[in-house]
């Protein structure tokens, strides 16, 4: 049965059983800012389940278009390399809104699979939640499922919409591909194999979870089911990979023809065949390539497909030509795709043409770097050079490295990125006031709160010395002033944006953005073309860096309030620096924070991130903001109207801020404190990372633990115990070594007495000794003093570029000669100084070669002192 026939059979079956066929909704969720894309069949019915959206039906069925390529549900990296990962898929579903419940859902599913599709009952396996006795009875007593092909699972069979709200147990139906395929049944240790494949999930929404975690029965239990079209098609067509079904085979053949590559099983062709579906349908739903949000995800998918085509030998635009094959395959089922086909082809062609030069050059450089790589880790410096100098996207570099079995040095890449920003900030401090040479009216209009791409006009150009220019030529560094810009200028502790100013044949790389005299100054270099005053340009902010900066900036607000809660109300912000890589936050506090305090601050911030509360921006008078409890920098000056940011659950943090921020606290991802230290009297500095920066840090730490484990010949979880055992063994060996050295020193002291001489009637020993450490030197001195009974002793040890000295005078002689004076005399000759008590003194020096002569001078010095 073909994919199109399965889709239609599903919809027809449920229509025959009283369900209304609901057309697929947009991939852009309506009125749901929590989702990047529609990623499940129930998403369009979310408000129906919550009782907010009354519909004229209580039963519905749909074939919903879904995308998983960003945010929590992100399959992008696996697409093309596994049998069932896709950026785009179709979810077949049937829904009941307070109508039929478990019995109806189970009967419908079983009837459709075994009767309409003709699947053998003995090839199906069913699971239910461990607590769902009702569903178990229906399956066993009414459906007659073989108990040997039935299992009860825990969290795998419980679904919830969020931390609170509708939820309930589920029942999953799996298809058994047979013993010739590796893998075990659901719930077994071998369940990750490919033998048993989930094809349908029936969710029984019967509870409402409150904030305390209590499950309260819903007055009208509902049903939400989902069956992946691609998966069930693979079952019916007798193949183990979704890419082998008819729908994908036609797209793979088209991709093969477009790229000139014949092997349709190649992962790169699978990537292309998958990506044309998600890209085409996203554009159908009015998502366009950009450097922010959904548009940025779309651009990433397009460029990934282009890169895989390039890998197969395609050197001319090809991706847009696949829209025709997709239209032939899916246009009848989704007429909106057919209608949008011309627009889709134009958008894809434009992206291909824009990316062509970057890809060709970047791939050549990356290939060369990989071929000459010494080891299995691509240095962060190389990755950064590709990204910064040649505009080669980081994620594409990662994709290529993955294929070659090479690891990326992400930490090194981030370090280079931060170094560049530091250089840019430093460079921006040199020279005169750039606006002094300009005759400009008004201010640069900032549009970056709403968008990361705009259309603007160049109002002025300045070189790095502050001289006004009429134009910039390729390779020339300078500063560009625009009439409007989405680039955030460094202020309020937030680093300025980076990105590009683009026009036909012109590209200016923005390495930093500063604010001066009401204008945004875009510092950078003209990469190609010519840029004239008055020219129209498209400013495009680096979306990934802006997003990372926003995560870090929003985290500083949560951090500030968490510090006040843990340390006290006296805590005030004293400064901050927010970049894409990390955040630095200075606060007033009188002592170092304890480990427990740091852990509690980190816990509070992450709890607010997990709460995923919406961020709120408001404009009000300064007095209104103060009345609201908004925090502000004590020494800062504010306008009459201020911008107030509220972030976190229950208005956790309220502060005045003009920076850019995440839409929800959950967008920060996670938060980790790197360090806490004093930077001035009464000021503590905290450095932290969030999101990808935190993950990169954790990966780096994990890698270090793995390396230590390898050195210790232990598993990572055994490192602590093995290290403690090793340290304990070292301590034991050190004690034994000290004992042996002491024993050796004792034996040596007897031999050294032969070198004692008499000076002015006093026994004197001035000698260089070997193989003795600091502790042993003190013990040796005591032994010699005891054996001499009365006398003066100076001992010296020469090491690598250092000298250790010790002098001793027996108590009967200290009135006439001081050990401190004696050791000082010797130390001065070996490049050191020292002193001590009358009976014992120590010193050091830096000229071991002078030690013999220094010790040789002791007799005359002692004789002179005793003769006084």
Curated annotation (Swiss-Prot):
One GO-annotated biological process of the protein: negative regulation of DNA-templated transcription
Region (Disordered): 831-851
Names of the cofactor(s): Zn(2+)
Catalytic reactions on record: tRNA(Ala) + L-alanine + ATP = L-alanyl-tRNA(Ala) + AMP + diphosphate
EC number(s) reported in the record: 6.1.1.7
Gene Ontology molecular function, alphabetical: alanine-tRNA ligase activity; aminoacyl-tRNA deacylase activity; ATP binding; tRNA binding; zinc ion binding
Keywords on record: Aminoacyl-tRNA synthetase, ATP-binding, Cytoplasm, Ligase, Metal-binding, Nucleotide-binding, Protein biosynthesis, RNA-binding, tRNA-binding, Zinc
A Pfam family this chain is assigned to: tRNA-synt_2c
Tagged with keyword S-adenosyl-L-methionine: no
Domains (record comment): Consists of three domains; the N-terminal catalytic domain, the editing domain and the C-terminal C-Ala domain. The editing domain removes incorrectly charged amino acids, while the C-Ala domain, along with tRNA(Ala), serves as a bridge to cooperatively bring together the editing and aminoacylation centers thus stimulating deacylation of misacylated tRNAs.
HAMAP family documented for this protein: Ala_tRNA_synth_B (MF_00036_B)
Function: Catalyzes the attachment of alanine to tRNA(Ala) in a two-step reaction: alanine is first activated by ATP to form Ala-AMP and then transferred to the acceptor end of tRNA(Ala). Also edits incorrectly charged Ser-tRNA(Ala) and Gly-tRNA(Ala) via its editing domain.
PANTHER family hit by this protein: ALANINE--TRNA LIGASE, CYTOPLASMIC, ALANYL-TRNA SYNTHETASE
Protein name: Alanine--tRNA ligase
Species assigned in the record: Chromohalobacter salexigens (strain ATCC BAA-138 / DSM 3043 / CIP 106854 / NCIMB 13768 / 1H11)
């Amino acid at each position: 049965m073909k994919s199109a026939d399965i889709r239609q059979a599903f919809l027809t079956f449920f229509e025959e059983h009283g369900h209304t066929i609901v057309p697929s909704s947009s991939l852009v969720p309506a009125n749901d800012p929590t989702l990047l894309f529609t990623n499940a069949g129930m998403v369009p019915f979310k408000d129906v389940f919550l009782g907010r959206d009354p519909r004229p039906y209580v039963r519905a069925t749909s074939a919903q278009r879904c995308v998983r390529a960003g945010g929590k549900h992100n399959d992008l990296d696996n697409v093309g390399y596994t049998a069932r990962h896709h950026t785009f898929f179709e979810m077949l579903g049937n829904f009941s809104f307070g109508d039929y419940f478990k019995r109806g859902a189970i009967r419908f599913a079983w009837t459709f699979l075994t009767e309409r599709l003709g699947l053998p009952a003995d090839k199906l396996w069913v699971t239910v939640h461990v607590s769902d006795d009702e569903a178990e009875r229906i399956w066993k007593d009414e459906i007659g499922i073989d108990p040997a092909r039935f299992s009860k699972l825990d969290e795998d069979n419980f679904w919830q919409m969020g931390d609170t709200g509708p939820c309930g147990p589920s029942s999953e139906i799996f298809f058994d591909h047979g013993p010739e395929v590796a893998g075990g049944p659901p719930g077994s240790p071998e369940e990750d194999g490919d033998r048993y494949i989930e094809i349908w999930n029936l969710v029984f929404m019967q509870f409402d979870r409150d904030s305390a975690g209590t499950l309260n029965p819903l007055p009208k239990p509902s049903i939400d089911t989902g069956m992946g079209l691609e998966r069930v098609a693979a079952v019916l067509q007798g193949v183990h990979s979704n890419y082998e079904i008819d729908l994908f085979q036609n797209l793979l053949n088209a991709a093969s023809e477009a790229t000139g590559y014949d092997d349709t099983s190649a992962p790169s062709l699978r990537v292309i065949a998958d990506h044309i579906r998600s890209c085409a349908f996203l554009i159908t739903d009015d998502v366009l390539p950009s450097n922010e949000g959904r548009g940025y995800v779309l651009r990433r998918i397009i460029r990934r497909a282009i890169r895989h085509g390039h890998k197969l030998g395609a050197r001319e635009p090809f991706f847009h030509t696949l829209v025709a094959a997709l239209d032939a395959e899916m246009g009848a089922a989704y007429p909106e795709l057919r209608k949008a086909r011309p627009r889709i082809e134009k958008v894809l062609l434009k992206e291909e043409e824009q990316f062509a030069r970057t890809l060709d050059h970047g791939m050549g450089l990356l290939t060369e770097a990989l071929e000459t790589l010494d080891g299995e880790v691509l240095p962060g410096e190389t990755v950064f050079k590709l990204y910064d100098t040649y505009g080669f996207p980081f994620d594409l570099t990662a994709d290529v490295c993955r294929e070659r079995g090479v690891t990326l040095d992400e930490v090194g890449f981030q370090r280079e990125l931060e170094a560049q920003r530091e250089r840019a900030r430093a460079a921006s401090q040199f020279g005169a006031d750039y606006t002094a040479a300009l005759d400009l009216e008004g201010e640069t209009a900032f549009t970056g709160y709403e968008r990361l791409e705009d259309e603007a006009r160049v109002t002025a150009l300045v070189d790095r010395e502050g001289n006004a220019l009429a134009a910039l030529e390729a390779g020339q560094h300078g500063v560009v002033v625009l009439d409007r810009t989405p680039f955030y200028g460094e202020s309020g502790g937030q680093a300025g944006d980076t990105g590009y100013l683009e026009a036909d044949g012109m590209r200016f790389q923005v390495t930093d953005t500063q604010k001066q005299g009401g204008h945004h100054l875009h510092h950078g270099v003209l990469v190609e073309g010519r840029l004239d005053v008055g020219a129209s340009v498209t400013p495009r902010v680096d979306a990934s860096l802006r997003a990372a900066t926003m995560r870090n900036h929003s985290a500083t607000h949560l951090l500030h309030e968490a510090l006040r809660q843990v340390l006290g109300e006296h805590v005030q912000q004293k400064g901050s620096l927010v970049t894409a890589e990390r955040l630095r936050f200075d606060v007033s506090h009188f002592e170092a924070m304890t480990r427990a305090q740091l852990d509690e601050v980190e816990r509070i911030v992450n709890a607010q991130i997990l709460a995923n509360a919406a961020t709120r921006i408001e404009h009000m008078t300064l007095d209104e903001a103060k009345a609201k409890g908004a925090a502000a920098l004590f020494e800062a000056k504010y306008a009459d109207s201020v911008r107030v940011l509220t972030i976190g659950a229950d208005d956790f943090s309220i502060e005045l801020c003009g920076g850019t921020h995440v839409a929800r606290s959950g967008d920060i991802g996670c938060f980790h404190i790197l360090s806490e230290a004093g930077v001035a009297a009464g000021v503590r500095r905290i450095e932290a990372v969030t999101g990808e920066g935190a993950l990169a840090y954790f990966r780096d730490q994990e890698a270090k633990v793995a390396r230590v484990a390898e050195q210790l010949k232990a598993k990572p979880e055994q490192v602590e115990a093995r290290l403690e055992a090793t340290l304990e063994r070292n301590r034991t060996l050190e004690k034994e070594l000290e004992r042996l050295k002491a024993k050796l020193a004792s034996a040596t002291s007897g031999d050294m007495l032969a070198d004692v001489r008499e000076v002015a009637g006093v026994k004197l020993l001035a000698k260089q000794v070997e193989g003795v450490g600091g502790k042993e030197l003190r013990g040796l001195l005591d032994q010699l003093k005891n054996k001499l009974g009365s006398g003066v002793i100076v001992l010296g040890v020469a090491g690598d570029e250092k000298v250790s000295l010790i002098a001793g005078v027996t108590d009967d002689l200290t009135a006439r000669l001081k050990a401190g004076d004696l050791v000082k005399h010797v130390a001065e000759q070996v490049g050191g100084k020292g002193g001590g008590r009358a009976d014992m003194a120590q010193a050091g020096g830096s000229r071991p070669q002078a030690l013999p002569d220094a010790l040789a001078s002791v007799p005359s010095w002692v004789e002179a002192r005793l003769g006084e």
